[in-house]
Amino acid sequence: MANRRTDADQIKALVERCTRDVADGLLPSCQLAIGLDGEIILDQTIGDAQSTTRYCFFSATKPFVAAVIWQLVSEGLVSLEDPISSFIDEFKENGKQNITLKQVMLHTSGFPHAPMGPKVWSNSSTRRARMAEWTLNWEPGTKYEYHPTSAHWVLAEVITEVTGNGHADEVHQRITSPLGIPRILGLDSGEQEGIADLSLCEGEATPDELEAVFGVREMPPSEVNDETIIRFNDVDTRTVGVPGGGGYGRAADLAQFYQALLHNQNNLWDPSLLKQATGEVHNHLNDPMGVPANRGLGVVLAGDDGLSNRRGLGRTCSPKAFGHNGVGGQIAFCDPHSGLSFAYTTNGLDRHQIRQPRRGTSIASLAATCVI
């Protein structure tokens, strides 16, 4: 990995930091990858896994879906200000008729925990029927709360409506295949060999620990719980291609995707729209913990307010760094200032609400300093 722009000592420190959690028995395995100048310069697997092992990306999947939407905007098939109901008629029910595509991408659309679930998510008609039932928690555009899965089911249905193809196929045909990345979404049973099964790591934070760090004695309720997380081990869940979190692949695939975003590889995106999506903040609203969202159109930007670590990007990246992490410690970002992209994946889902984000901050902070 000889490259005059890399810092060998920092790379060594990064690998040692990632190795420590596996050696200490906190995680069963992990992968990490660094991209630079359009290539993968570090591809490391640690623990009970192979270099070919694939991991669940969880919400690090979301930018792949957004990347399709960017193309559709450039092609004139959709507009960011289009109401979702103009594509999905059923969506207009219960006061949702004016919610725009942009609001859905920014997580300000007002249905953060609207249910979908295995009983209805396998085909378009049942998904649309479920969307008709969804109700609003607030007036769209007035508040920000992360939508773990609901928003991207809507984006997936828009993709299907305007292309005539399933969202998982469109992600592969438009994004991953042109980049030489294996299919990540909608994997048939015969395509699932070599995926690391997820396991829960014991040891939740106590109420006193939570209060000392976050100022609350319990974390806000979320649909992302142990049961829903472990469901991503199921063959059927892997097959359906959950658009907000059901991508599977290697850390190197994630790092390569972000290199493609940095360099607009193969001219996959309109340059001005790519800049608008990944380089501009469109959502400044605070999250429920009081941290400004700093969201672009499908990614999170680090920002210059000293809160980049609260957004999952560590403490040492530039304000223009952007990415999107996934539950359980998945990390994926790039930094236009240095040209680095970084990804970290693990199948050990640390349930400790303080240890896990601190691990992420430590790893991301080290990674961002590996390129001089």
What residue spans do the PLM features occupy?
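A glycine-rich, coil/turn loop motif that links secondary-structure elements
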Residues: 90-98, 143-148, 247
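Short, conserved alpha-helical segments within structured domains
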Residues: 84, 97, 147-151, 273, ...
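Recognition helices and adjacent regulatory flanks at domain boundaries
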Residues: 118-121, 129-133, 137-139, 144-146, ...
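Flexible glycine/proline-enriched surface loops and loop-helix/loop-strand junctions
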Residues: 50-51, 135-141, 151-153, 234-243
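Active-site helix/loop module of the DD-peptidase/beta-lactamase fold
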Residues: 51, 59-60, 64, 72-116, ...
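Catalytic loop of the DD-peptidase/beta-lactamase superfamily, centered on the K-T-G motif
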Residues: 2-45, 56, 61, 143, ...
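Short amphipathic alpha-helical face segments that pack within enzyme cores
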Residues: 63-68, 150-157, 252-256
